[in-house]
Amino acid sequence: MSEIALIGKKIGMTREFYKTGRLVPVTVIKMEKARVIQVIEEEKRGYKAVQLGFGKIKASKLTKAMKGLYAKKNTEAKKKLKEFRVKDTELYKEGNEFGLEIFNEVKFVDTTSKTIGKGFAGAMKRHNFGGLRATHGVSVSHRSHGSTGQRQDPGKVFKGKKMAGHMGDRVRTMQNLEIIKTDIENELLYLKGSIPGSKNTEILVKKSVKVINKMTINEKIAAAEEAKKTPDKKKK
């Protein structure tokens, strides 16, 4: 089940207190259950995958093609469809639903969401440029990004040049975010730290791709308490 992901909506941020006195900033995500719409076999497309549906949508907003798909699968319409490559398709059956339980044994996750849009921004705000001098002959262009090219050779502005432009509203992935706790009854997921996006931003959550040997906060607290119980051999 670690091959698939879930989609949720960002509720906001709060904080979690521990008995050791430590305070941890937490992002709360309202997760949605995923339904298996169809299972894709290797014989048909050359790879194994599972297609999951998320959210609710009115049938009047669907295209004829999507209406035909849901009618063929005899399932209710879903707002979004996501396809995930899997190694074994026997674990998934059409119509089955998955929720937060797929993260029961997972410590760290990756999240993908869209950043907050900032509109048109200058080079100093967008790329953290220092700007030009405040005095000594500089006029009007104090917050300018400066030169954008060379001379006759190469005679052009290279692609990727950092300049003023639209800031934010980009899809970004955060890796190795620690799961603080899960509330399966209310379908809430608590992750350590901040996640890009405003309230109600859709967030894709999946098991971390990178394997890291890192202790969670709960494991650190348990290890510290265990160390207090064991007598120190140096002290006599």
Curated annotation (Swiss-Prot):
One of its GO terms (cellular component) is cytosolic large ribosomal subunit. Belongs to the universal ribosomal protein uL3 family. The gene is rplC. One of its GO terms (molecular function) is rRNA binding. Disulfide bonds: none annotated. This is Large ribosomal subunit protein uL3. It comes from Pelagibacter ubique (strain HTCC1062). The lineage of its organism: Bacteria, Pseudomonadati, Pseudomonadota, Alphaproteobacteria, Candidatus Pelagibacterales. One of the primary rRNA binding proteins, it binds directly near the 3'-end of the 23S rRNA, where it nucleates assembly of the 50S subunit. The keyword Metal-binding does not apply. Signal peptide: none annotated. Methylated by PrmB. Part of the 50S ribosomal subunit. Forms a cluster with proteins L14 and L19. Residues 139-165 are annotated as: Disordered.
